[in-house]
Amino acid sequence: MALEGLRAKKRLLWRLFLSAFGLLGLYHYWFKIFRLFEVFIPMGICPMAIMPLLKDNFTGVLRHWARPEVLTCTSWGAPIIWDETFDPHVAEREARRQNLTIGLTVFAVGRYLEKYLEHFLVSAEQYFMVGQNVVYYVFTDRPEAVPHVALGQGRLLRVKPVRREKRWQDVSMARMLTLHEALGGQLGREADYVFCLDVDQYFSGNFGPEVLADLVAQLHAWHFRWPRWMLPYERDKRSAAALSLSEGDFYYHAAVFGGSVAALLKLTAHCATGQQLDREHGIEARWHDESHLNKFFWLSKPTKLLSPEFCWAEEIGWRPEIHHPRLIWAPKEYALVRT
């Protein structure tokens, strides 16, 4: 009798295992199928009535009609920058006329430094704000290991030491507080606009003054066509980053965001405060600082959005609307860099 009961339990466990394995396979199969057909999900169209009213500080009147197949503006009147909708030469001249200095921050902690930093900086020298005044801020736990990269005229690199955290999640979440302190200090005094980027990516095309605005958000390459109910916002109501099913506009990528010093001080303060509140309540948002970033952009709308061309993942595959990727995700070797 006991033996028969044991066999029954084993059969039940095997059935549960096979069912779980089957559901997992179905999920992955469905996800791949969904990826093939998501190109047919409509993005919406910028209303013709507001197109002439959409002007950019650096490129003048934008050519939204040049890209009728994609969404080129938001419901609150912010432009979404796609290839062919702007004149890069106009933007470059305007930035030089204003004699701007653009800051570029990047965190290279632990093995991220040797794996990604040199390629990031070399490609930035080739494509990021070419001909403009640029100051790089590299935050790292090993300042002595930062590679030497030849810099062009009017371009500086500053290395800022940071503490290495025990978990990679803590590195991600400490970023907002570190950026807030830097923006309130030397970085805020010497830069007019600042862009904050992840290090595990590299520039592949011109990333110029056409991206500048008071508050800039990056559409996430994996989610820019998804309906709102599918977007991976924080749903735990206890978290300061939580958004309800009726909230949210787009899903923004924390690998790229930027703006004026004043606007970024508000952004980083909001995110750092939200993370601290979550920590005090023993909560950790699903996507860490990115979850808090999305909450901030829901409450404080960005004044310019960058299309996925400005931060693209090649593993997604070919997409007809992606003409010229400007920034590419490097291969993610988490097993190597997060240990």
From Swiss-Prot:
Residues 32-339 are lumenal. GO terms for cellular component: Golgi apparatus; Golgi cisterna membrane; vesicle. Binds 1 Mn(2+) ion per subunit. It catalyses: a beta-D-galactosyl-(1->4)-N-acetyl-beta-D-glucosaminyl derivative + UDP-alpha-D-galactose = an alpha-D-galactosyl-(1->3)-beta-D-galactosyl-(1->4)-N-acetyl-beta-D-glucosaminyl derivative + UDP + H(+); a beta-D-Gal-(1->4)-beta-D-Glc-(1<->1)-Cer(d18:1(4E)) + UDP-alpha-D-galactose = an isogloboside iGb3Cer (d18:1(4E)) + UDP + H(+); a globoside Gb3Cer + UDP-alpha-D-galactose = a globoside GalGb3Cer + UDP + H(+). The keyword Metal-binding applies. Mn(2+) binds at residues 198, 200. It is a single-pass type II membrane protein. It is found in: Golgi apparatus, Golgi stack membrane. GO terms for biological process: carbohydrate metabolic process; cellular response to manganese ion; glycosphingolipid biosynthetic process; lipid glycosylation. Residues 1-11 are cytoplasmic. It comes from the Eukaryota. Substrate binds at residues 107-112, 198-200, 220-223, 332-338. InterPro entries: Glyco_trans_6, Nucleotide-diphossugar_trans. GO terms for molecular function: alpha-1,3-galactosyltransferase activity; glycosyltransferase activity; metal ion binding; N-acetyllactosaminide 3-alpha-galactosyltransferase activity. The chain crosses the membrane at residues 12-31. Keywords: Glycoprotein, Glycosyltransferase, Golgi apparatus, Manganese, Membrane, Metal-binding, Signal-anchor, Transferase, Transmembrane, Transmembrane helix. Glycans are attached at residues 57, 99. The active site is at 290 (nucleophile). Its cofactor is Mn(2+). The keyword Metal-binding applies. Belongs to the glycosyltransferase 6 family. Synthesizes the galactose-alpha(1,3)-galactose group on the glycosphingolipid isoglobotrihexosylceramide or isogloboside 3 (iGb3) by catalyzing the transfer of galactose from UDP-Galactose to its acceptor molecule Gal-beta-1,4-Glc-ceramide. Can also catalyze the addition of galactose to iGb3 itself to form polygalactose structures. Synthesis of iGb3 is the initial step in the formation of the isoglobo-series glycolipid pathway and is the precursor to isogloboside 4 (iGb4) and isoForssman glycolipids. This is Alpha-1,3-galactosyltransferase 2. It comes from Rattus norvegicus.
